C-alpha cells in the first residue's frame, strides 16, 4: 500500500513540477507527435507458417494434426516424398504470422513480424520460421517472411518440476519480412492533407488549424487549414506547394495541446492514473472494511496401541472478524497535489481508492471522466 501511495504521490509531484518549471515545454507538442496523416496509416498482414528446429518443444502430431499436414505439404512442394510412417519428432510448430505494413513502404524494404503458436508447442525458442507469405485483407500477398525467431521468455523442465518465465509460445522475427508489393498510393496527386488527432479534442484541433494558417499566410499568402471536427483537420494544398515539403513543414509546427480531465482505473491490476486537470468538489468520505478470516486446522487422532481403532481426522475451525477504517476525511481537490494528499490521508489500499473514486463520481463531485478498464 505504501508503494502505491508513493507512486501516486510521485506522479503528482512530477506533474506539478513540470507545470511550474517548464510550462511551455509541458503544454506544447509538435503536430507529428499528436496527429497522423490519414493517408499514412498502417495495414495489417497475416499468414500461416511453420517453425522448425525446435528442441523437442514443438507440436505433437496427435494433438495438432494440422502441423503434420502442413509439414507434408511443404516437403511435397520441395520435391521430397512423404510416404512412410508417422514421425514423432516434436521439432516443428504451426504458427500464425502477423505484421503491420507501414505507409509508403516500397518493395525490398523489411518489416518485423510476430509469430504465435497454434498447436500444443511449449516453446518457440531456437526455432526458424520458414518461408511464409503474408496477405492483406484483400487477399493479395504483400510480403514474405523467414528467419530466426527471438523469444523473450524461457522454460526449464525436469522430471518433477517446471520453471517458466514470460511467454515462450510467441516471438518476433526482427526484419524478417521482405515487402514484395507496395500499396497503391495517391499521396502526390492529393489536393489536400487530412490530419487525424490521436486524442480527439476540439480545442487542440482549432489550435492546429490556427497554427497551420499562420504558417500558410506567411508562406503562401492565405489560410489553408480548417478543423473539420474534434479529430480531423483538413489542409488544402496551395497551388505552388510541393505536398511532401508542405507536410514536412506542417508536422514540425509547435502547437499547444489540451486534453479532457480523466481518471483511468484498471480494476484487475489496481492501477489508477489521475490526470493533472482532475478536480474534486468538497466532499466527505468515510471508508471502512470488514475482514473475516476462516482458518482450518484439522487434528489427527491416533488410536491406542493394539486397540484395533482407526486413525481419524477431527476438524477444527477458527473464525476471526476484524473491522478497520471508518475514518471520515474531507477531500477538496483544486489541483492534483491536493487531491492525492486527500486520498493518502484516508489510508486505504488501491481497491479502496477505486471504490472511493467511483463513489465520488456517483455523488457528482468528481469533475472528470471516469474510465474503467
Swiss-Prot record:
GO terms for cellular component: bacterial-type flagellum basal body, distal rod, P ring; outer membrane-bounded periplasmic space. InterPro entries: Flag_FlgI. It is found in: Periplasm; Bacterial flagellum basal body. One of its GO terms (molecular function) is structural molecule activity. Keywords: Bacterial flagellum, Periplasm, Signal. It holds the Pfam family FlgI. One of its GO terms (biological process) is bacterial-type flagellum-dependent cell motility. Residues 1-26 form the signal peptide. The keyword Secreted does not apply. Its main location: periplasm. Assembles around the rod to form the L-ring and probably protects the motor/basal body from shearing forces during rotation. The basal body constitutes a major portion of the flagellar organelle and consists of four rings (L,P,S, and M) mounted on a central rod. HAMAP family: FlgI. Belongs to the FlgI family. This is Flagellar P-ring protein. It comes from Rhizobium johnstonii (strain DSM 114642 / LMG 32736 / 3841).
